[in-house]
Curated annotation (Swiss-Prot):
Region (Disordered) residue spans: 326-348
Gene: recA
Molecular function, one GO term: ATP binding
Binding site for ATP: 64-71
Domain of life: Bacteria
InterPro entries: AAA+_ATPase, DNA_recomb/repair_RecA, DNA_recomb/repair_RecA_CS, P-loop_NTPase, RecA-like_C, RecA-like_N, RecA_ATP-bd, RecA_C_sf
GO cellular component: cytosol
Function, as annotated: Can catalyze the hydrolysis of ATP in the presence of single-stranded DNA, the ATP-dependent uptake of single-stranded DNA by duplex DNA, and the ATP-dependent hybridization of homologous single-stranded DNAs. It interacts with LexA causing its activation and leading to its autocatalytic cleavage.
Species for this entry: Listeria innocua serovar 6a (strain ATCC BAA-680 / CLIP 11262)
PROSITE patterns: RECA_1 (PS00321), RECA_2 (PS50162), RECA_3 (PS50163)
Name of protein: Protein RecA
Pfam family, one: RecA
Predominant location category: cytoplasm
Length: 348
């Protein structure tokens, strides 16, 4: 047994000498066993994710039909990162980012790094450079479907380019996955959906860009509109369902229901009323909502408005709900610079 241990120790020393300290270790000796997260900016989504937010150093895919709220979900996460003093980058391959809308959602557009690349290769090279810097906490690519390979852009309109985009994504993710994990960057890939022709049974919907992103993603979120939210005859927004279809860090298939209001994004008050009523932090009797035996509104919309006007009570309820769901922020790490991440460029 001693000979085997001595041989193992020798092998470990050789590996560390060749590949550097920390290249191999016992899992129990790893200092960062808990998954550190950054809030998604939505209480309901934080709860559905199971760990209180997006896991750092992982790849997230957000997909769904057009105008379902995919970019809104990503922008809320950027606002949350910036609120904690972190740096965020947005690679706008669709050339469709609305700065005014982003500002309404709480994004500091003066500090947001923005790139509008010409080709898919350029977009992914920029993404790699940003991640390797070790100084970017969140990177959003909008969208995978718009990452057009250079050969397709330079070719004729009717030319066939079978599998080019899938190969591009597969190669990029092979390069990015390791360095994303080391740098603790959250990489959010927004994706569209397409339909397979001739599918008789099962779901005909697929996401562009091949299968690689499905495999490399730690979390996959499906965003879909459920119903319109009306005030009288005016449509004010949409009730949206966000389904966690894949989750490597917590149980999957949980669903978050949020109100996405036009021009405002996710209504924090709306999801707070729903989640608080679910765990009896807010009491619902008939159509009346009450907190600590004090009525806060008749009907959901009035309760939302009350919380919007009384931010101290809203924050108190939010804290209690997070404690009930055991996502009180104990797994949050400060977004500060460290020697390990900032030396990623030097190691190459």
């Amino acid at each position: 047994m001693n000979d085997r241990q001595a041989a193992l120790d020798q092998a470990l020393k050789q590996i560390e000498k060749q590949f550097g300290k920390g290249s191999i270790m016992k899992l129990g000796e790893h200092s960062d066993q808990n998954i550190s997260t950054i809030s998604s900016g939505s209480l309901a989504l934080d709860i559905a994710l199971g760990v209180g937010g997006y896991p750092r150093g992982r790849i997230i895919e957000v997909y769904g039909p057009e105008s379902s709220g995919k970019t809104t979900v990503a922008l809320h996460a950027i606002a949350e990162v910036q609120a904690q003093g972190g740096t965020a980058a947005f690679i706008d391959a669709e050339h469709a980012l609305d700065p005014a809308y982003a500002k309404n959602l709480g994004v500091n557009i003066d500090e947001l790094l923005l790139s509008q690349p010409d080709t898919g290769e350029q977009a992914l090279e920029i993404a790699e450079a940003l991640v390797r810097s070790g100084a970017v906490d969140m990177l959003v690519i909008d969208s995978v479907a718009a990452l057009v390979p250079r050969a397709e852009i330079e070719g004729e309109m009717g030319d066939a380019h079978v599998g080019l985009q899938a190969r591009l994504m597969s190669q990029a993710l092979r390069k990015l996955s390791g360095v994303i994990n080391k740098s603790k960057t959250i990489a959010i890939f927004i994706n569209q959906i397409r339909e397979k022709v001739g599918v008789m049974f099962g779901n005909p919907e697929i996401t562009p860009g091949g299968r690689a992103l499905k495999f490399y993603s730690t979390v996959r979120l499906e965003v879909r509109r459920a119903e319109q939210l009306k005030q009288g005859t005016d449509v004010m927004g949409n009730k949206t369902k966000i389904k966690v279809v894949k989750n490597k860090v917590a149980p999957p298939f949980r669903i978050a229901e949020v109100d996405i209001m036009y021009g405002e994004g996710i209504s924090r008050e709306g999801e707070l009323v729903d989640m608080a009523a679910e765990v009896d932090v807010i009491n619902k009797s008939g159509s009346w909502y009450s907190y600590k035996e004090e009525r806060i509104g008749q009907g959901r919309e009035n309760a939302k408005q009350y919380l919007k006007e009384h931010t101290d009570i809203r924050d108190e309820i939010s804290k209690r709900v997070r404690e009930e769901y055991e996502i009180d922020g104990t797994n949050k790490e400060p977004l500060d610079e460290n020697e390990e991440t900032l030396s990623l460029l030097d190691d190459e």
